[in-house]
Amino acid sequence: MADRSKGFMRAEFVTYAYILLYIALSSGQIFFNKWVLSSKEINFPYPLGLTLLHMIFSSVLCFLLTKVLKIVKVEEGMTLEIYVTSVIPIGAMFAMTLWLGNTAYLYISVAFAQMLKAIMPVAVFILGVAAGLEMMSCRMLLIMSIISFGVLVASYGELNINWIGVVYQMGGVVGEALRLIFMELLVKRKGIKLNPISLMYYVSPCSAICLFVPWIFLEKSKIDGNGPWNFHFVVLTLNSLCTFALNLSVFLVISHTSALTIRVAGVVKDWVVVLVSALLFADTKLTIINLFGYAIAIAGVAAYNNHKLKKEASKVVTTETPGDAESIPLVSQGNTNTER
């Protein structure tokens, strides 16, 4: 009995450790990206190049983990037809999301960017209805209205609003919503389930190619114009490694808990980012209106996640089989973008 109790406590400790690791890495990566892009010491104001570096690093590490070291097994079922019709669009939207989201940090504060991202469920719902994946209902309209109202109030309370940054951030939100829609279409039409490492194994190279083309035309000339490349490669490598570690932490949390846990942790992370950024960055000045509006939006997001999880749970009960805990569907309606 004592051994069983110790084993349970040990399992609980490990679970909470993974959750705290996810919150720390997710929050820290956002601050890390902001610092790399805006710091004069690092001198790397190239969001497209930073995102491209992340995807190349992720591609190499995923290849090493799955094909060389064989620590993680790549999920089977991927075909050329699925890759062309589903993975490439997902990779393109993923690249667009990270690129525009990182670019927004050059114009707006981390806290305000996080507040704007709360509108994500609204974009996903609207596109989902257009794609035939969501049904319009009074309850969902009420939830979407609450989220939208909260984001509007938070935006109204922003002291130093920069509309260029807002446009970039909203573009990132639309890209992420499209990515989630493509992923849900892939799940419903093909029935493919991948763990995060397998997902990044397939998506990262595609995203890297999608980013490389605009990088050649938009940023390479700027970098070359500043003289010989003399960047802090240790810092950039560490930044890329932290991004990959964040993706791995998502895998660990989901495999030891559930999708509900990662979403609750995501809400906690959002508040941590908003509050801590006010202490770390001089461009972040929170107001009572900011926080009040964001609280309203988060309440709407929580209601949305609860509604979606109940809907998903009713499906899982009849279809779940042993071993499913280590694979997650290629869809997440919450704000779980790991690199922004």
Curated annotation (Swiss-Prot):
InterPro entries: Sugar_P_trans_dom, TPT_transporter. Residues 320-340 are annotated as: Disordered. Keywords: Membrane, Sugar transport, Transmembrane, Transmembrane helix, Transport. The chain crosses the membrane at residues 12-32, 44-64, 80-100, 110-130, 141-161, 163-183, 197-217, 234-254, 260-282, 286-305. It is found in: Membrane. It is a multi-pass membrane protein. This is Probable sugar phosphate/phosphate translocator At3g14410.
